[in-house]
Amino acid sequence: MAQLPPGDIATMPNQKVVFNAPFDNKATYYVRVINPGTNRIGFAFKTTKPKRINMNPPNGVLGPKESVNVAISCDAFDPSSEDTKGDRVTVEWCNTPDPAAAAFKLEWFQGDGMVRRKNLPIEYNV
């Protein structure tokens, strides 16, 4: 039996993550991840700047029609001395092999199963 591809997810906001100056304190931006589909999914966040950008929770499981708010935090930094071009967070998701899975498992993303990605560029308003 062929594996079903993961359905779409929705994020709010849909296009990008925005952090506003000043950048001398930690700032947090919330992204809602929504599973509008009919299958349980596992999701995981990644970033191009793991020393500056953190996500909480960084991964999880969403049942059909469920959602979660993910806190994306940016540690204090000096934008004049650091390259911010290309900064982004990426959410990856896949169908869970077990429709009743309640806990995230990294192995879902390490096999040959289908994984989808959505990139959210980070914009820094100086």
From Swiss-Prot:
Keyword Cytoplasm (UniProt): yes
Keywords assigned by UniProt, alphabetized: Acetylation, Cell projection, Cytoplasm, Cytoskeleton
Expression by tissue: Sperm.
N-acetylalanine modifications at: 2
Domain of life according to the entry: Eukaryota
SUPFAM superfamilies: PapD-like (SSF49354)
Principal subcellular localisation of the protein: other
InterPro entries linked to this entry: Ig-like_fold (IPR013783), MSP_dom (IPR000535), Nematode_MSP (IPR051155), PapD-like_sf (IPR008962)
MSP domain boundaries: 8-125
A cellular-component GO term for this protein: pseudopodium
Subcellular location: Cell projection, Pseudopodium; Cytoplasm, Cytoskeleton
Protein role: Central component in molecular interactions underlying sperm crawling. Forms an extensive filament system that extends from sperm villipoda, along the leading edge of the pseudopod.
PANTHER family: MAJOR SPERM PROTEIN, MSP DOMAIN-CONTAINING PROTEIN-RELATED
Name listed for the protein in its UniProt record: Major sperm protein 2
Organism of origin: Globodera rostochiensis (Golden nematode worm)
